[in-house]
C-alpha cells in the first residue's frame, strides 16, 4: 500500500537523520532478501533495529488467518526478520524492535500475538488514510535496559509515545521480559 509505505519511509528518514556520523546504517529489505540475505547483510552490524509494518503471519506463532481487521502478510519478510533476530541472539548483537519489530522478536522466541485488540488506547484503524498515530503513555519497568536508556526523559517512570497497533503480545516469548507497557497492559 503506497500510503503505508510513505509512512514507513518517513520513519526511516527520521532514523537516518538521528544516526550519528560514525554509524553505518544499512537498510535491509527483508521481503527482497529473505532469510539468507538478511542474515548475510547483518554480519558485522553493531546493532539491529526492526521497524514496524504489516501483520506478522499467524503461521509464525501457531495461529490461523481470518481474524478481525487482518492486515496483509509478507511471509518472506517475516522469514528475513526472524533470521535477523536469530542472528542477533547468536552473536549478542543489540536488537531493538519497534511496533511489528517487537512482535517479530516475541514470535522468534516462541511467543504469541493477540490478533486483534479492541479499539482504545493505541489503535487507529485509519492510520493508512489519516497518517495519525495515537499518543499515549507507557510505564517503563524499573531496572530494565530501557529505563537506563530513557532515564533523562522519564517522568515518574513514564514516557509518552505514538503507536497505531491492532495486535499485541499474548504470551511472552521464552527468555524475554517486559520493559514497558501501556495502561491497558499492552
Task: State where each predicted segment sits.
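N-terminal beta1-alpha1 cap of cysteine-dependent amidohydrolase-like domains
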Residues: 1-96, 106-107, 111-114, 118-160, ...
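The feature captures the ABC ATPase H-loop/switch
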Residues: 102
